[in-house]
Amino acid sequence: MPHDIDHNTAAQRRTSKLLAAMAIFICLGIVAYIILTLLVNRQTPANPDTHFDAENGISVDYESAIWPVCQMTEDAALGHALQLASGEDSANANYQVVLFQRGDKATYEDFIGQSEADLKAAYGVISPRKVKLQVEGATVTAVRCDIQAYYAVLATIEYDSGDVVYVSGLTKLASISDIVNLVESVSLT
């Protein structure tokens, strides 16, 4: 009988140590997740060195080293839009792109909702989250959708004049501040 008691006590001590080790491991995982989340969502200040007035009446200030491609394009979904991209090759793993379309409230019934539905149909789980963006003289509604190793950023920028800028962007997880800075520099000409 004393042998069984010693055996049970030793087993309980091992179990307690194992549970303590598991708790420490879980806590370290939580801390690592928080640190990574803060790094990914850091707000890097913008240093725009280029101003561009697009044909569609949208102006943007941007960093030419980050956005070397700035041009008007015809997009299948958005039509005539201003495109800023990190390069010409969309197959590049670090490729990021933002499209700006000017319209009014009637251009889309629910731009963000429709875009989320399209992304969900194409990629499955997209995990949309609201993003707080500020554009001077406008009301901004924006979401960030997590798509595997990428973020899709969708926004509507509504001006008092009735004009609306529709924004669609795609970036790597660590580069979301590049798109945030770009969107926050938008104005109408």
Which residues fall in each region the model found?
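N-terminal Lys/Arg-rich, disordered targeting/topogenic segments
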Residues: 1-16
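Short, compositionally biased strand/turn segments
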Residues: 33-53, 103-108
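Hydrophobic membrane-insertion alpha-helices, especially the h-region
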Residues: 20-37
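N-terminal "mature-domain start" segment
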Residues: 42-79
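Conserved polar/disulfide-associated segments of primarily extracytoplasmic proteins
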Residues: 18, 72-165, 170-174
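Surface-exposed amphipathic alpha-helical segments
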Residues: 64-67, 160-189
